[in-house]
UniProtKB/Swiss-Prot annotation:
Identification of the protein by name: E3 ubiquitin-protein ligase BRE1-like 1
Main location: nucleus
Protein's GO biological process: cell division; chromatin organization; defense response to fungus; innate immune response; leaf morphogenesis; positive regulation of cell division; protein monoubiquitination; regulation of G2/M transition of mitotic cell cycle
Domain notes: The RING-type zinc finger domain mediates binding to an E2 ubiquitin-conjugating enzyme.
Induction (free text): By infection with fungal pathogens.
Tissue: Ubiquitously expressed.
Coiled-coil ranges per UniProt: 48-76, 200-261, 293-382, 537-624
SMART domains in the record: RING
Amino acid sequence: MASTGEPDRKRRHFSSISPSEAAAAVKKQPFFWPSSEDKLDTAVLQFQNLKLSQKLEAQQVECSILEDKLSQIKEKQLPYNSSLKTVHKSWEKLTASVESCSVRVSDSSSGAHRFVNKEDGSSPAVKNDFINRLLETGATESSSSNICSNQMEENGVNTSSQMTQTLYNLVAATEDLRCLKDELYPTVLRTNLGKDLCGQLALSELESEIKSFRGDLDDVLVKFKSLSRELQSHRDADAKVRVDLKRIRGELEDEVVELQQCNGDLSALRAERDATAGAFFPVLSLGNKLATSDRERDKQRDLQDMETVLKELTVLASGRLQQLKNLHEERTKMLGKMSNLQNKSKSVRCISSSQACLSLKDQLEKSKEAVFQYMALLEKLQVEKDSIVWKEREINIKNELGDVSRKTSAVTDSRMASLDSEIQKQLDEKMRIKTRLGNISRERGRKEIFADMKALISSFPEEMSSMRSQLNNYKETAGGIHSLRADVQSLSGVLCRKTKEYEALQLRSADYASQLGDLNATVCDLKNSHEELKLFLDMYKRESTDARDIAEAKEQEYRAWAHVQSLKSSLDEQNLELRVKAANEAEAVSQQMLAAAEAEIADLRQKMDDCKRDVAKHSDILKSKHEEHGTYLSEIQTIGSAYEDIVPQNQQLLLQVTERDDYNIKLFLEGITSRQMQDTLLIDKYIMDKDIQQGSAYASFLSKKSSRIEDQLRFCTDQFQKLAEDKYQKSVSLENLQKKRADIGNGLEQARSRLEESHSKVEQSRLDYGALELELEIERFNRRRIEEEMEIAKKKVSRLRSLIEGSSAIQKLRQELSEFKEILKCKACNDRPKEVVITKCYHLFCNPCVQKLTGTRQKKCPTCSASFGPNDIKPIYI
């Protein structure tokens, strides 16, 4: 803006606007000075506070709504918790029943005899592999381990231990049955050996079938392992999906934060726009109008850009929500597949009803029939086997007799050589121990070290007591010095008192001396007056007198006066004599007192000198004692430091002593051990000698036994009969074993039926648990969707509120702009803008209206009717 006058005229021009219009403008729009553009008006702050309070109330209402929804969801979850508890209880009952069944099976099978075939060593490995696979895949725990509660996680260890125990019991029972079969197989093979080739072929076929059965079982286990791996992969995929969900949620939260920041920027821009709209005075120039229009265009452009970004973000958020829905559906499908796979892998019925298991059962029945056939063949082959065995025994006895003699001689020779080498080693060890003991005995004895240490330790208290006595003496001497100091102080006090008395006596003697001087002066005056009187008398005697009467009268007068004077002088002399006597007596007394005081002062000075000498002596003694005390303290410190140095040395010596003791104890123990070893070696040597004697006796015994072999052959027939009886006993024991086998089979069938029932219950409970988990997961997903929809609705509401607030602000700005335009219009015509100012009253009008007024005679202002001339009209530029 360019005005026509000085600053005072500008101020008048500003004040030319009517006060009502200015008040209305202030009420409608807050006023900002150009120097405080960053400050807000109180009205704007109140308006913002009101908005914030409204937002807070809305957020409180939303929080209360969300809390109600959360309480409703918790109430919905209560029946699920009770159902989960019932499922856990049923699962615990089922595991307890399975464990009891396995314990009964293991107890029933514990009496059976176990025999492991060395040729087929795969059965324990298969058992351990089967149990490890079951435990690795989590067959003993719930199928959804990722979603289970904290209580299931806490009780998982106990349940897993119980299930492992039950599995071990079941596998042990099956292993007992297998061992029994493996025990029966060699007996059958021995009985039927060499009887029939067809039997051998059947046995080989049976063996191959059993091996194929085992291979099928291994294949089943491999399939089970593959299924468990697939299940684990599905679990890993589920975990990955959850991680992706978390990541997507984090991205959504970041985007929400960005949106909130954008909303904050929008609100800040709007506040700046409001501030800039109200920061300038309504009377603006054309350049400012263009600048504000450009700013409004820029802000509108920014708003449009932000709206487009917001739309893109909403589209992206909807796409992410759709992805989340798809992922949730895939996850539910995967959970269903996982539950089906787990049920298939953990159900005994499926395994038992599989084709491989049925074929194995058929093969097992066929093998049982073949076993019974081969039992009959075994009975036939037993007789031939006995004859062959007797012949083999005869040959073996002959061979063994020769081998025994050779082996005994070789064993005795090797044993003798080993014993000689061990004896030599023990002798070397004994010599080494003796040398070590001799070296130890040469070293300084322990008693001498202890005696030195005791003497050193006993000398310390004596030295300390002597030092303490010296310190006590020093303390006593220091106490005597203190008493002497007290005596000196008392004597110095007495001396001061005597000196004060001496000064007082000196003052008195000075007074007496002054009095004596006064008396002497008076005596001198009297003597002078007496001489003057004598002179006067001589003068009067020499004077010449005319008449004799006058002379006589004068003589009488003079005589009388002389008599009076003589009386006076005599009186004065007497008084003076009395006073002189008194003064002399007082002087004598004072002289005596002074002499006594001087004597006392001399005595006190002598005593003081003696005390000073004593003090000097004692101070010298004290200094020497202090020096000695310092030396003693330094010696004590050196002794203390030496004692402190000696203490660690003493500790080191004690440690060395303890180490020596430990070393001596070790040597003693080593000596004991060496003695024990020597004793054991002597005992072994004695035993070896006995063994050698026994070997020689055994050789003689074998030589005798060779002569008795013929006698033993005679008894072979008797032994044959005994063997027949043993055969009968073995057949009886075989029948008993078959009965036990039948009982075990019945118990196993019962255990299998119970196990199938328990597995069916477990499967049913797992299915119910899986369904409940699916429902719970769906409920959680729905809850999350509702929460996300609520957040989206909140964002929409906030966006709509911001749009509504922005539209209301734009309307206000437009109204204010129209008002400013009306203010800038001419008040005379209300059509054209203000272009001219009248400098008399500083009112603004358009140029045509002013020209009309100048054309008339009465040139007066239309607003204030003030007269003006053509020179008072000045143009302005807005």
